[in-house]
UniProtKB/Swiss-Prot annotation:
Domain of life: Bacteria
Gene Ontology MF terms: oxidoreductase activity
Entry GO terms, CC: cytosol
HAMAP family recorded: LutA
Lineage of producing organism: Bacteria, Bacillati, Bacillota, Bacilli, Bacillales
Function: Is involved in L-lactate degradation and allows cells to grow with lactate as the sole carbon source.
PANTHER family, alphabetized: LACTATE UTILIZATION PROTEIN A, UNCHARACTERIZED PROTEIN YKGE
Family assignment from sequence similarity: Belongs to the LutA/YkgE family.
Protein name: Lactate utilization protein A
InterPro entries, alphabetized: Cys_rich_dom, LutA
Species, as recorded: Exiguobacterium sp. (strain ATCC BAA-1283 / AT1b)
C-alpha cells in the first residue's frame, strides 16, 4: 500500500476544502494510505514570484522539514502550480551543500495528483461515472513546467458518461498567474475573457481543471457574466464518479 502525504495547497485548504477531501478519498479508493502533515503552509510561490527569494527559502525549509517528519513514500498535491514550486526547491538551494540534497529528495517524491495516479499507480480508469458534457482547461505551470498533458485526458477519457469537448486555444493562460492578476488586473481580465469565450464556444456544461487557482479565476468571471457553467476540479469529478459507480 503506497504511503502518501497530502500536500493540500493554500487554496484547497482555505477556500476549496472539497478538493482536498476529494483528493484524499480518491487516493484511498485507489489503495493508498494517506496522511496529512498539519504543519504544512504555503509552498512559497507568491513570495518567490514577487522577488522575495530569501523569504521563500525560509518557507521551503519549513515545508521540507514538515514532509521529512511525515516520512511518507510520496507527496501528492492537487495542483500543478504548487507542485511545480516544490519541485523547484533544489534551485533555491543550488549553492547550499546542506539544504540542496534535502530539497532534491523532497522534490523527487512530490507529484501532481493526476500524474501520480497515471504514472506511479499506473491507473487510467478509476471506475468513475459522471454524466456530463465538459471541457478541460490545461493550466500553464502544469503543462509547460511539469510537462503533464496526457494524464488528465487519460483519466477523464475513461469516466463513464462524461463527454469531453475540445477547448479552443487550450494552452492559453487564464490570466490568473498568482500575483500577476493583482499586479496587472487589466491584462488579466482581457485574458480571462478570452478564456471564457472559448469555453462558451465549446458548448460545455462543466469546466474541469487541475488547478484551483485557475478555476477560481475562470469561475469567478463566468459567474460575474451570468453563465451557468459548473466549474469542478478534476479530483472532484473523479471522486464523485467513484461515489456514484
Amino acid at each position: 500500500m503506497p504511503n502518501v502525504a497530502l500536500f493540500v495547497t493554500c487554496l484547497s485548504d482555505t477556500l476549496f476544502p472539497s478538493v482536498g477531501q476529494a483528493t484524499v478519498e480518491l487516493l484511498e479508493h485507489l489503495g493508498c494510505e494517506v496522511t496529512f502533515p498539519f504543519e504544512q503552509t504555503c509552498c512559497g510561490q507568491p513570495a518567490y514570484n514577487s522577488g522575495y527569494h530569501e523569504e521563500t527559502k525560509k518557507i521551503a525549509k519549513h515545508m521540507i522539514e514538515t514532509f521529512e517528519q511525515a516520512d511518507a513514500e510520496y507527496i501528492v498535491g492537487p495542483s500543478g502550480s504548487c507542485v511545480m514550486m516544490m519541485r523547484d526547491y533544489p534551485h533555491l538551494f543550488q549553492d547550499d551543500p546542506v539544504w540542496r540534497p534535502r530539497a532534491e529528495a523532497h522534490a523527487a517524491k512530490t507529484f501532481e495528483l493526476t500524474q501520480f495516479i497515471v504514472d506511479v499507480l499506473e491507473v487510467t480508469d478509476v471506475g468513475a461515472k459522471f454524466p456530463a458534457k465538459a471541457t478541460y482547461h490545461a493550466s500553464c505551470h502544469m503543462t509547460r513546467l511539469l510537462g503533464i498533458e496526457a494524464a488528465p485526458g487519460k483519466l477523464l477519457g475513461n469516466v463513464d458518461g462524461l463527454t469531453m469537448v475540445p477547448l479552443a486555444n487550450v494552452h492559453n493562460c487564464c490570466g490568473f498567474g498568482g500575483t500577476f492578476s493583482v499586479k496587472m488586473p487589466d491584462v488579466s481580465v482581457q485574458m480571462v475573457d478570452e478564456k471564457v469565450d472559448s469555453i462558451l464556444q465549446s458548448g460545455a456544461e462543466v469546466l474541469i481543471g487541475a488547478d484551483a487557482s485557475c478555476l477560481m479565476n475562470i469561475g469567478g468571471r463566468l459567474h460575474k457574466q451570468g453563465h451557468p457553467i459548473k466549474v469542478m476540479h478534476i479530483a472532484e469529478v473523479l471522486n464523485e464518479g467513484v461515489k456514484q459507480a
